Amino acid sequence: MTRADAPSPLIGVVLDERIELSVAELSAACRVQVGQIVALVEEGVIEPVAPGFRSPDDWRFAGDVLARARRALRLQRDFDLDPAAAALVLGLLEQIDALNAARRGR
């Protein structure tokens, strides 16, 4: 096996609520424009850590928001939903997940 054929190590960062992302970092991680992240905030899909800031440049997001944002953006893309519809569907899917978890926990 040559060096070029050698497997490369997988490097990653575990994102949780202790890690904070800027709006630019979140949009880059989601591979979308900042405007799409702003739309998710406006619809209440995701919320900045300190929501009082008016400018998106000042927003910071907990790392665990990344998964929710990606899921909402995937719903928008796959089903051609606007941000409001994606927020509704995402909320319903999360309720289903919670009900299934509660049922399994009995």
List the predicted regions and their residue ranges:
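Arg/Lys-rich, alpha-helical DNA-contact motif
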Residues: 2-24, 34-38, 42-106
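Residues within the alpha-helical elements of helix-turn-helix
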Residues: 29
